[in-house]
Amino acid sequence: MSPESAAPAMPTRTPDGILPSAARSTLLVENAADAIQRIGPLVRITPPARRYALWELARRAGVSPEVFQTWTIRQEARGTVLNVFPSKGKQIFFPNARPELLRQLSRNEMPVARKSWLVEPDSQIRALVPDFIVPFAGESGASEPLFLATSSDRVECTVDLLLVVLLVLSRWEESIATEHDNHGRFASQQSVAFKHGFLERPIVDEYGLAFEQVLTFLNPAWRPAERRLRAKLSHDADHVGIPFQPKNLLRHMVRGSATNTWREIWGWLPDCEPADLRAVRDIVNVTRSYKLDSAVYWMASPPSLRDSGYDPKHRKIRRVIDWLRDQGVESGVQPGYSTFRSPERLRREINTLREVLGDGPLGGRQHYLRWCLDTWIHWEMCGLTYDSTLCYADHLGFRAGTCIPYQPWLLSLNRPADLLEVPLLVMDRTLLGYMKLNEEKSVDAVHRCISRCRAVGGVFTMVWHNNALHYPRYRSLYTKLLKITEGADRFDWKAELSSALGNAPWKSKCAIGS
């Protein structure tokens, strides 16, 4: 079978970049200095950044490294010319943004365009993706397609889609934000996605569907890889009942839970686990009963108003961590409230957690979902291998426009981060707390989210705190959400990690076109 018709497989990549070493396309950069664009004084849109965005788009279309390596990429001041399926003479053109659009973005103006399909999709996809929503690309109506066929051999993109992919995945808009909530977080209401009503759509992954359609139009013999839903469920162990706190005892008494009340009273005995610690075992077992995997994220922060301050080296906690290890359940990290924007505090807590969890690859998320662009850099400095913080506390949805794990681009450093981002989509307290949804509406909202993940072959991610099981309505809702997630494939983050951190093509020398 020829590379052009081979069914694409998940790319394999080497340690510090994006593209697979076998998939180094021919790169021609014509007058590379002219190909660099700027948004304000600090953000440079370089040829390597555009190649990164092109790969992120291509892999979301199901493009294999074998197919990608046959392409020729020519980058010039006016845009990127992509020769795909070269034996057939097929070409795709991605224009660079006009200077006036870059000036708009420099003024923090964020125009949003709506685009249509090249070819009408099937009704199931059409229901989920009626059009393409394209931020940072100028304004237009949905009558103009995202990709326009100028002949049977050439297709042109009608916006600077590579810039859009780059800015959305890198969270550029958060770098210029001036308003934050009382925890220093970028709130959903400040995002262009919330303001324009597309926070619950994985727009970057939807561009992959459009690009897949373009490739099929140019070469009907080509087929993308099958898209399958995967799931990664996790539990933030904010509270484990150690050290003993009277308010926990009072909480169980008020709820009328005799079992948990006595567990809290006798939790100091050697063989009795406090109710919150026991809940770690319980929530893992509940999740596994639906044939789904869990991960538990532990803390090592000192006591504070926002941190319970337990010691992960406590013998009872170690006993649960050992049990998780024996059960094949991942244990990860949850750096405390004060580690946000504090790399030194972060390093101290990670070092403590490594003493308990071991020296292997570790991932997790920030406590309180406190995240900013520097978080990627700080986690990278600590040797952490994946982050799963990127979600709004106050609204479910696709903060990064994607449900497909990816290697983030660091705009400030003009390079990819040496870690994987596994975007978080749903948190327990978001549904019943911040959004004030009832159980039925919560299930409906998550079901829509899962349907969109399935359509693009993404990873459905959700965090449910261990002690949430103490509350009947949270326990009831969790089991209902597990039921609609049941059947999703396991997300193998270690395999994804080894394939994602590959040999970056922008580090290789490029031939200069004439």
What are these regions (language model features)?
Residues 236, 334, 379:
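Conserved hydrophobic/aromatic pocket- or pore-lining residues that grip, position, or stack substrates
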